[in-house]
Amino acid sequence: MASEVLLELQPSNRSLQAPANITSCESALEDWDLLYRVLPGFVITICFFGLLGNLLVLSFFLLPWRQWWWQQRQRQQRLTIAEIYLANLAASDLVFVLGLPFWAENIGNRFNWPFGTDLCRVVSGVIKANLFVSIFLVVAISQDRYRLLVYPMTSWGYRRRRQAQATCLLIWVAGGLLSIPTFLLRSVKVVPDLNVSACILLFPHEAWHFARMVELNVLGFLLPVTAIIFFNYHILASLRGQKEASRTRCGGPKGSKTTGLILTLVASFLVCWCPYHFFAFLDFLVQVRVIQDCSWKEITDLGLQLANFFAFVNSCLNPLIYVFAGRLLKTRVLGTL
């Protein structure tokens, strides 16, 4: 399996000279050749639209603060609590896509990393940090809507702009801390059988596989998704409960458009990232040799690569969702005209 060798080598336990999976699983070479040809262009396309879309989103959120931008404005617009979270999510997506050109080149070179050890660690660490930052921000966004809609009378005492800003800061710090192992353990090593110098994770001990699974699949997915499902279930229940009362109101319940935007963002995030975490868990089972069948190893390996880049799509989908499913950007755009 190419990605097993290139991403999670254990030089203390397995020889770099003869990875068993390379010689025993040759049936998917044509599939890998196709991926090497197709995925780099796909990743660059995602990077282009992700950069363009998220830069536009951030400009619409942040530029009204700049007095020199529109001298005729009578007052400055302050970001709402929802906008603070969404601006941070756009910033996270922007930082995330900045690392994609390096991986596009890496795949185009058949995992031969040409940028050196420092960029190997920095690019991998930044991508890993933003994986956590993104899902933690989705939890925070869902929790904020939950408080506003399910406990509207008491939420005003808790929902403060400074609190939202502090929450976002803590999320960025948490993402950085959780990415430290990636910064420390990523390195460029020669893999003779593949004739490449690969940017890989070098685990010093078998137990690191379990630690990585807990970090990635539990802290980075299962626990946040449980919270997201809980909050959004009650949000939908609250909206259903308000439906009868809002029938006579023009436009429906207060905040329903913003809530619709956020629910769409949450659904998009889960659809894009669930396959990645599913195959990441299967990859963990391969690493600890619970899965040993060659065909399953190839399915896991190829599936993880495809799911990886399917997850990247989320970074350029979010700006489209802001425009087509929500009123926040429309309000900001009209305010600058």
Curated annotation (Swiss-Prot):
Q: Which GO terms describe its biological process?
A: cell migration; cyclooxygenase pathway; G protein-coupled receptor signaling pathway; inflammatory response; negative regulation of blood pressure; negative regulation of cell growth; positive regulation of leukocyte migration; positive regulation of release of sequestered calcium ion into cytosol
Write down the glycosylated positions: N13, N21, N195
Which CDD domains does the UniProt entry name for this protein? 7tmA_BK-1
Indicate where this protein resides in the cell. Cell membrane
Record-level Gene Ontology MF annotations:
bradykinin receptor activity; peptide binding
Cite the InterPro entries for this sequence: Brdyknn_1_rcpt, Brdyknn_rcpt, CCR1-9-like, GPCR_Rhodpsn, GPCR_Rhodpsn_7TM
Q: Which GO terms describe its cellular component?
A: plasma membrane
Cytoplasmic topological segments: 63-83, 143-164, 239-261, 327-337
> What top-level branch of life does the organism fall under?
Eukaryota
Tell me what turns on expression of this protein.
Answer: By lipopolysaccharide (LPS), four hours after treatment levels show an increase in many tissues. After 12 hours maximum levels are observed in the heart.
Q: What does the record say about its membrane topology?
A: Multi-pass membrane protein
TM regions (residue ranges): 42-62, 84-104, 122-142, 165-185, 218-238, 262-282, 306-326
Q: Which UniProt keywords apply?
A: Cell membrane, Disulfide bond, G-protein coupled receptor, Glycoprotein, Membrane, Receptor, Transducer, Transmembrane, Transmembrane helix
Q: Which segments does the topology annotation call Extracellular?
A: 1-41, 105-121, 186-217, 283-305
Q: Which cysteines are joined by disulfide bonds?
A: C120-C199
UniProt family annotation: Belongs to the G-protein coupled receptor 1 family. Bradykinin receptor subfamily. BDKRB1 sub-subfamily.
Name used for this protein in its record: B1 bradykinin receptor
Originating organism: Rattus norvegicus
Lineage, broadest ranks:
Eukaryota, Metazoa, Chordata, Craniata, Vertebrata
Gene name of the encoded protein? Bdkrb1
